């Protein structure tokens, strides 16, 4: 168009050659302009040669041909994909989809036994600290003194009870409590040692350093530090290390050393650790590495059963656990191999059905959704649902007779309990009213909702034909057998299913049905049912093999389940489409698939780790509930304790667990006994609460309240301070008693009579450097609110110090100001650090190696799958 417009403006006598020449010139000019601008703007350096243009033209020609061929390929690809999509839509209308929740699988697989954590330091609550000494006038001396202080001296802000501090401390001890201690791993060099000796850990070494460098340290102590070293008794595999510990810390660490969970490891233990049924399974060849050192150790997993019975009345918790188990089980069920070609099978089925133009719609429906993906999906769903005891629901179209006939196989091999009742009733009713009753000319069954009997149970009483009634009887009584193996409750399939004999029973019933006259139905209807039965009966051998394969894979993987398989219907269900069951029945080949040994070991390890962690977390929660009860914090902390317990199991979304289940869980946890180690640790804390309170800079042992002013007293540790070191001469009231009774009259009367009163009991106090700012608000903050609100747990007395380190010291020195306060903090002196009393020798094994993965010593292989045999010593797959 542009060319014509330009030509219209020119003279009429311009010939065609000129026009063509002009057009080429214009194109070249434009190209040159573009190239020039590109060259100016580009940062590349370009070497100009004479024949550059010719080379570029040749390159452009090559590029254009390449682009054309690419476009052609893309067109062909999209055409192929489009055809595939159309085929997919035609053949695969109803395929179940499973989206694995990878996050849950990762959480489960990431649960590792906590024994793996290596201790690098001893457990300590206290540390020695160097504090200055103040003279009587508040000036700092050059000397200092050592006291034991708390390492983590943290009290949260807000209304806080010191008893909560002890509960948190106990929780911290439980978290850090080691399963084993190997002192050799944490020992460090003593820098001040004469002969390169070692002390037990880095904190002991740093304390020794600080004491050695302190000018006031006695020569005898320095000489002792220089002599500090380990003492090895090689013949007994024992080593003693010197340590510097507070007596309470020593009691903790000595207890940990005496109650280690490690046990000697030998080949028998590893052999017995492998599930018995896998050891005895002839399809698996297990070999063990026999070179275990004598110092090998392991920690026995804690596999106690059903202490909380989560299947009983914990619907949402049980649903989460079964979902996690289902996702894990699906990841280990083997994929089917060498399935029959979908196209070939559909062609064969079409021939068997003699599909032609006159064929009724119902028979073309038989082929809907048959594909290998659906077959594999169905196989994995059935086994994983049984392993995790997840309830299934069935999706089907009543007019697809092939689906219903496949459903008859499904109901034969999978126990009724595995299906949600509504779905089971709907499927059975469809089979009865579509196939069984019409065959015998019986009227449709009108099923009343809520009937305790299922349609098959009603039909069993009404059907006269022996074979059909016999099959119905089997289905109605098809339940899991509960068998305890190695202390674990297993849900075992019926022997007739395991060996595949039940399929003969099913086929007899189907043959009887196909021979019936269907007197009340048209001929086409009868023919459709007969052809559907024919399709399934043609694959009798493959169905027997499929049933044996399903049972074998289920029972082999079940050997790796460590928690009791409790059967309770789940809140949510796993959907199973009957078209996928048809796919499985029609496409199963003769290739045997069994789980690989590596898969079995992985599945077993994940189950053991989760189960062991579950029991340890129960022990922690039970211990903390007991501690909260004994510290009178029962009401306050209970829901938080249960929430923490669920969080530490990793798989629960705690925010979505209903409150009623939380409190039910608390009630179950309360009934359990406390594990001995955890109880002993709590008793250690309880016996030494006074020492721990003394060592804190934020916990007081009481508060003295008066209306008249009380002068600050001089203290070696702080200077001038409103601290009372004893309560002589004061009327005392116990804080616990006050909180329990809520009777404040006694205190009010004393204060009105100008008598100071001492409230005794552990409580937090506030420290602040500015005395003046505190004195102004002292009465209101410390006690007025308490009397008004009748809440002792908001009581926070204020401590302040005036010494040469504080800004207020000069006010006192210059103006002879005598600071006073209407409250005093009652605080006992912390324990003084004495080197001789703090020196302890700790004893442990010189060396041992802890193995967490016992199955790493086992090398395993399988026989050729084609030779794999089931429990009856016959090949799993017999049909060739």
Swiss-Prot record:
Residue numbers marked as site, Interaction with the intermediate capsid protein VP6: 220, 224, 228, 839, 841
> What modifications does the entry list under PTM / processing?
Sumoylated with SUMO1 and SUMO2. Sumoylation of viral proteins seems to have a positive role on viral replication.
Instruction: Give the region (5-fold hub) as residue ranges.
Output: 1-80
Q: State a single Pfam family of this protein.
A: Rota_VP2
Q: One Gene Ontology cellular component annotation?
A: viral inner capsid
Q: Where found, per UniProt?
A: Virion
UniProt feature, compositional bias: Basic and acidic residues:
19-30
One annotated GO molecular function is: RNA binding
Show the segment(s) annotated as Disordered.
1-39
Q: Where do the segments described as Hydrophobic lie?
A: 394-414, 422-442
Cysteine pairs forming cystine bridges in this chain are none
The UniProt entry's sequence similarity note says:
Belongs to the rotavirus VP2 family.
The protein in question is named Inner capsid protein VP2
Give the organism the record lists.
Rotavirus A (strain RVA/Cow/United States/WC3/1981/G6P7[5]) (RV-A)
């Amino acid at each position: 168009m542009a060319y014509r417009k330009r030509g219209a403006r020119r003279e009429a006598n311009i010939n065609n050659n000129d026009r063509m020449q002009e057009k080429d010139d214009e194109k070249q000019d434009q190209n040159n302009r573009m190239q020039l601008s590109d060259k100016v703007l580009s940062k590349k350096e370009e070497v100009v040669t004479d024949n550059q243009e010719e080379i570029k033209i040749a390159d452009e020609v090559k590029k254009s041909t390449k682009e054309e061929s690419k476009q052609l390929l893309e067109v062909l690809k999209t055409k192929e994909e489009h055809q595939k999509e159309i085929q997919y839509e035609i053949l695969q209308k109803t395929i179940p989809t499973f989206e694995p929740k990878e996050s849950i699988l990762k959480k489960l697989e990431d649960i590792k036994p906590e024994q793996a954590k290596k201790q690098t330091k001893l457990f300590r609550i206290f540390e020695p600290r160097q504090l200055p000494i103040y003279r009587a006038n508040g000036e700092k001396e050059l000397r200092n003194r050592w006291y034991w202080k708390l390492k983590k001296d943290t009290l949260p802000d807000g209304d806080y009870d010191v008893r909560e501090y002890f509960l948190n401390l106990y929780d911290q001890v439980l978290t850090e409590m080691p399963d084993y201690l190997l002192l050799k791993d944490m020992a460090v060099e003593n820098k001040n040692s004469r002969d390169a000796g070692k002390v037990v850990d880095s904190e002991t070494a740093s304390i020794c350093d600080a004491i050695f460098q302190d000018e006031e340290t006695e020569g005898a102590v320095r000489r002792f530090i220089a002599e500090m070293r380990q003492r090895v008794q090689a013949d007994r595999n024992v080593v003693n290390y010197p340590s510097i510990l507070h007596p309470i810390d020593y009691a903790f660490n000595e207890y940990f050393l005496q109650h280690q969970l490690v046990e000697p490891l030998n080949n028998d233990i590893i052999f017995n650790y492998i599930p018995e049924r896998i050891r005895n399974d002839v399809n698996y060849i297990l070999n063990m590495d026999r070179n275990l050192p004598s110092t090998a150790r392991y920690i026995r997993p804690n596999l106690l059963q059903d202490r909380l019975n989560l299947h009983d009345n914990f619907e949402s918790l049980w649903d989460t656990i079964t979902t996690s188990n289902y996702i894990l089980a699906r990841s280990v069920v083997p994929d089917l191999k060498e399935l029959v070609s979908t196209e070939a099978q559909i062609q064969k089925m079409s021939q068997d059905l003699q599909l032609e133009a006159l064929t009724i719609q119902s028979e073309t429906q038989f082929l809907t959704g048959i594909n290998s993906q659906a077959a594999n999906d169905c196989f994995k769903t059935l086994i994983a649902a049984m392993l995790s005891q997840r309830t299934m629901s069935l999706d089907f179209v009543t007019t697809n007779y092939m689906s219903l006939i496949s459903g008859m196989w499904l109901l034969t091999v999978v126990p009724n309990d595995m299906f949600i009742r509504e779905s089971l009733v709907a499927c059975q009713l469809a089979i009865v009213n579509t196939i069984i009753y019409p065959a015998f000319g019986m009227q449709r069954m009108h099923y009343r909702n809520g009937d305790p009997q299922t349609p098959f149970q009603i039909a069993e009483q009404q059907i006269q034909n022996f074979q059909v009634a016999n099959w119905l009887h089997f289905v109605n009584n098809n339940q899991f057998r509960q068998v305890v193996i190695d202390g674990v409750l297993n849900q075992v399939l019926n022997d007739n299913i395991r060996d595949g004999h039940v399929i003969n029973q099913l086929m007899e019933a189907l043959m009887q049905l196909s021979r019936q006259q269907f007197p009340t139905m048209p001929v086409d209807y009868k023919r459709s049912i007969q052809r559907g039965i024919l399709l399934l009966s043609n694959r009798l051998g493959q169905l027997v093999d499929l049933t044996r394969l399903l049972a074998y894979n289920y029972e082999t993987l079940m050997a790796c389940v460590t928690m009791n398989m409790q059967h309770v219907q789940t809140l949510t269900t796993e959907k199973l489409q009957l078209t996928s069951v048809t796919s499985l029945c029609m496409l199963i080949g003769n290739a045997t698939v069994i789980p690989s040994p590596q898969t079995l070991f992985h599945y077993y390890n994940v189950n053991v780790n989760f189960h062991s962690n579950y029991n340890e977390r129960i022990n922690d929660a039970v211990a903390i509930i007991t501690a909260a009860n004994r510290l009178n914090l029962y009401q306050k902390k209970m829901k938080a304790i249960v929430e923490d317990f669920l969080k530490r199991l990793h798989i629960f979304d705690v925010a979505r667990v209903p409150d009623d289940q939380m409190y039910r869980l608390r009630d179950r946890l309360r009934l359990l006994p406390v594990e001995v180690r955890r109880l002993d640790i709590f008793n250690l804390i309880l016996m030494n609460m006074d020492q721990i309170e003394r060592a804190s800079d934020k916990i007081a042992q009481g508060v003295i309240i008066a209306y008249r002013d009380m002068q600050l007293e001089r203290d070696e540790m702080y200077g001038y301070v409103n601290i009372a070191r004893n309560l002589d001469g004061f009327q005392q009231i116990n804080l616990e008693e006050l909180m329990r009774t809520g009777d404040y009259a006694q205190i009010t009367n004393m204060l009105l009579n100008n008598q100071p009163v001492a409230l005794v009991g552990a409580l937090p106090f506030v420290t602040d450097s500015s005395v003046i700012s505190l004195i102004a608000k002292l009465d209101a903050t410390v006690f007025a609110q308490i009397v008004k609100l009748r809440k002792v747990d908001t009581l926070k007395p204020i401590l302040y110090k005036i010494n040469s380190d504080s800004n207020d010291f000069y006010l006192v020195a210059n103006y002879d100001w005598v600071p006073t306060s209407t409250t005093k903090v009652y605080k006992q002196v912390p324990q003084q650090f004495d080197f001789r009393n703090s020196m302890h020798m700790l004893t442990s094994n010189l060396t041992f190696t802890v193995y967490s993965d016992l199955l790493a010593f086992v090398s395993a292989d399988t026989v050729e799958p084609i030779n794999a045999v089931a429990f009856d010593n016959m090949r799993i797959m017999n049909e060739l």
